A protein has these predicted regions:
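Rossmann-like dinucleotide-binding cores of NAD(P)H-dependent redox enzymes
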Residues: 1-52, 56-57, 117-124, 132-166
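A short, glycine/Asx- and small/polar-enriched loop/turn
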Residues: 46-51, 104, 191-195
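C-terminal catalytic lobe of FAD-dependent flavoproteins
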Residues: 59-85, 159-195
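FAD-site-proximal beta/loop scaffold in flavoenzymes
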Residues: 60-138
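A short alpha-helix-loop-beta-strand transition element characteristic
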Residues: 87-90, 137-146, 171-178
Length: 195
């Protein structure tokens, strides 16, 4: 199988440390995956039993299959929020205060429709904060500063807390950075070089 992955930005996995992003790209290339950045598909047409994708960089890719992942957008338009007076941001997310109340006090929102960190455990934590605030008599806010995130890639990657760039911005050069690579024990037996 030959795989080409296009990404419209300068690199994938926005929000992760640059060295992690670069490491994953290197490992993917070792597996034979062709990565093309700053590129998008202009058009896909069927030619016989194949597909031809015209790219905005002038190249063409002939392939058996195209998967076009366009990102996520909250499905908040046209469900009556505007009629209820709820303020939506330009991207369709719902504007809320620190206790998840919209500008209409009886309407609260949490999870992916906020456009913050779109992870199930974050939405669960937000739901618990709302329950504590409304029913527990304990106004509760959510701290988004140390949310773990994982990508089920090969190799898998994860992070928690600030990226190096964010840490440098917040603490100038008063940080230490240590990098280490290791080969998982299971790979030593199979002679897999993945790190």
């Amino acid at each position: 199988v030959k795989l080409t992955q296009l990404y419209r930005g300068p690199h994938f996995l926005r929000g992760f440390d640059d060295d992690i992003r670069e490491h994953l790209a290197t490992e993917m290339r070792k597996k034979g995956i062709d990565l093309v950045f700053n590129c998008n598909i202009d058009m896909v047409e069927k030619k016989g039993d194949r597909l031809v994708a015209d790219l905005n960089n002038g190249e063409r890719i002939e392939t058996d299959m195209v998967m076009y992942a366009t990102g996520r957008r909250p499905a908040t338009r046209g469900i009556g929020l505007e009629e209820a007076g709820v303020q939506l941001n330009d991207n369709g997310t719902i504007a809320v205060d620190e206790h998840f109340r919209s500008n209409v006090p009886s309407i609260l929102a949490l999870g992916d429709v906020l456009g913050r960190i779109e992870l199930t455990p974050v939405a669960t934590t937000e739901g618990m904060a709302v329950a504590n605030t409304l029913f527990g008599g304990k106004p509760t806010t959510v701290d988004y500063s140390n949310v773990p995130s994982a990508v089920f890639s090969q190799p898998p990657i994860g992070s928690v807390g600030l990226t190096e760039a964010q840490a440098r911005e917040a603490h100038a050069d008063d940080i230490d950075v240590y990098l280490s690579e290791f080969r998982p024990l299971k790979h030593t037996i199979s002679l897999n070089e993945e790190r």
